């Protein structure tokens, strides 16, 4: 009644309209606040989902590490290198998560998609054992940096390097990890990682082809290791037969399949080399030297393979730094050959010949004698390598570079493990989180994940 008496109907309507506008603004404000917080909760929900997926990926990696340990226990016996067809390596389901083992194909130099499997550490050069003569022939390395590596690991400084500006002193002790190379004087990303910044063995679209070669130029991280160690005894702990000190009975027992006459001929030849009637005897330098000698005495490759895992030329408990010729990369082989004073052209030709032979004759790689079959008894490369103990066909350390994702391809994680089976059961020597390097599974894996999650 007061509204009607004081202002009339028009004044009352104006008052009611003002209230309506205020109410509308209040409603708009409340709705905006509600939408804002709802949007914030959507982001929080996504973040929580990603965290959950990440936890699932972490657990998938833990499960994958156990799986790899079991695979090594079953297949990496007596120095054998497990084949990626013997166990699952790609998109292996662990609940709603999946994992991959990012490997390297030893017979393919220019992969366009990641190769899945274990990485044989025995296929690499050991930073603590290989000389400057070998290191300097690796691509993307300078002779100065090769000297710096020797200086870092040596008990006494080999060269005079000023680490003052870097804020630390040289170690003057063996390398404990490959990543320790980052601390060596003169190290650069280009030298250590090459063009493979995410270290998956593939030139990805996000990585720059610096020299426009169309191929990946890998760095030292892919070519060196610190873990290789090969037992010089049988798996049950019994000793191998040292051919440099073996008796007639031991040699004849090893080569039983040759027959009595051939056994005697071989023993006579071995004894004449070790203990000639005149002059100084010559010990066998390594397994390749002994294999070459046996081949020249008419022993077949199969005949030598039957005894290869039972003989040695050393009294050391372990061999350190020998390279597995069955899995070594082309660049590593070339560096090894040139380090043994083989000329570059011959080294490159021999390396390619060995890789081709490996691809065409995968069942003939049981002993070191296959190198002689591939290159020939009179090869200058074989002769040079026989002067030392550089090569083997056995491996006991393997890297498992495990990447995993949770449901819908979320929560990407990546961890690298180094496994050692030289003392029997597999054990983990080293663990490194590589998630910071970004996606390493290639475009095809991403497309497959997206396709499956949108079906």
Model-derived features: positions:
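Compositionally biased linear targeting/interaction segments
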Residues: 2-7, 16-455
